[in-house]
Design a protein with these regions (language model features):
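N-terminal Rossmann NAD(P)H-binding glycine-rich loop of SDR-like oxidoreductase domains
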Residues: 5-25
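Active-site-lining helix/loop region of Rossmann-like oxidoreductase modules
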Residues: 8, 143-299
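N-terminal Rossmann-fold cofactor-binding loop
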Residues: 32-36
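Rossmann-fold cofactor-recognition segment
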Residues: 45-59
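Rossmann-fold NAD(P) dinucleotide-binding segment
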Residues: 65-66, 80-98
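N-terminal Rossmann-like NAD(P) cofactor-binding module of classical short-chain dehydrogenase/reductase
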Residues: 69-75, 96-97
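Rossmann-fold NAD(P)-binding glycine/threonine-rich loop
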Residues: 100-121
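C-terminal active-site/capping subdomain that shapes the small-molecule cofactor and substrate pocket
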Residues: 251-355
Length: 355
């Protein structure tokens, strides 16, 4: 194993942002992608130092066993397709990091815990705004407390958009939310629920009023593991509302389960052009509320700037720590592995109730 970091999907927005932060930290990089011209452009923006690797995902993974990098950072979506494929291809001693918030992808990586531990590897899934932000608030609320009876987490990202296509990673997350009939934890079991259920309006510490609804996301799994609560709801401001929720959303899961429809939907959304624009609000927010059988309740917030910036910072911090030998072998979410302080290291600020 060497100390190189392979960044898969290095020409996408998230991949570029992570690569820049790692390069500025002096980490030896291999930029991985399918388009030589775009990879060369990314490398030129970093000073031309990184090594480039062109090819399909399959050919890239075939080369892992020979090169044995220190860490592989996966930003290639949809993660439900790529996450386990990439993690399984990592040779003994090579660590894995992704930025997914897709529930199946998070489950797939966590299911590789024994494989990772046996190989002396650390697999970290959800090392971005999705998963880490809400997970870290809940971990803070539950520190030195017995398991709560009920928890709810809400993610409210505010991100600036650059000109270009949506991209496969974000498209995969969107389709993952739309294709699910909903999930929640009820009586300690992961169960199906109505699409876009549990609506709420939250007033953030700076006075914004934001609407959220529950969905199937990696945040749900992370919140369940962080709290061990019997009832867990994970909600997001990304879930549509209004007439779309009432009439269209309930039918989408069945449509997207038709063979071949889901990849077509991901591909179509990934190609949608978007215009450059500033983020709509100054802050992104993650919120958590926990209630105990005694009647005690606590809630807290994590304040973040741009959600994309936080994702890049979080993935970079996790990668840096793995290169330094931190983290126990196995598969985990970032907050569970490194504690809620990881969110602060990535630029977040906690605002918590005081018991």
């Amino acid at each position: 194993m060497n100390n190189e970091v392979w960044v898969l999907g290095a020409t996408g927005r998230t991949g570029r942002m992570i690569a820049r932060r790692l390069h500025e930290a002096g980490v030896p990089l291999v930029l991985v992608g399918r388009d030589r011209q775009r990879l060369e452009g990314v490398a030129a923006g970093l000073g031309g130092a990184p090594r480039l690797l062109m090819g399909s995902l399959e050919s890239t993974l075939a080369g892992l066993a020979q090169d044995r990098p220190g860490v592989v950072v996966n930003t290639v979506g949809p993660f439900t397709t790529t996450a386990a494929q990439v993690a399984r291809a990592c040779p003994v001693g090579t660590h894995y990091v992704d930025v997914t918030n897709e529930l199946p992808a998070v489950q797939q990586i966590l299911a590789l815990d024994r494989q990772a531990a046996a190989g002396g590897q650390v697999f970290v899934t959800g090392a971005g705004f999705g998963v880490l932000a809400t997970e870290s608030v809940l971990l803070r609320l539950c520190q030195r407390q017995p398991p709560p009876a009920r928890v709810r987490v809400d993610a409210m990202a505010s991100v600036g958009m650059e000109a270009g296509a949506v991209g496969a990673a974000l498209a995969g997350t969107i389709v993952g939310i739309l294709s699910s009939s909903g999930r929640e934890v009820w009586h300690g079991r992961l169960v199906g629920s109505r699409a876009a259920a549990h609506p709420a309006q939250l007033t953030t510490p700076d006075g914004d009023v934001l609407a959220t609804r529950s969905g199937a996301s990696g945040e749900l799994i992370a919140a369940w593991r962080a709290s061990n609560a019997g009832s867990v709801i994970a909600a997001t401001a990304l879930v549509p509302s209004g007439a779309f929720t009432r009439f269209v959303l309930p039918a989408l899961p069945a449509v997207l389960r038709i063979p071949g429809v889901r990849p077509l939907a991901v591909s179509a959304i990934a190609r949608i052009p978007q215009h450059a624009q500033q983020r709509p609000r100054t802050w992104s927010w993650a919120h958590a509320r926990a209630e105990w059988p005694s009647g005690e309740a606590r809630e807290g917030w994590l304040r973040i700037g741009d959600g994309h910036d936080f994702t890049a910072a979080a993935a970079t911090e996790v990668t840096r720590r793995l290169l330094e030998g931190q983290g126990r072998p196995g598969a985990d979410t970032p907050g569970a592995l490194f504690g809620p302080e990881l969110a602060e290291a990535a630029g977040g600020t906690f605002i918590l109730d005081r018991p």
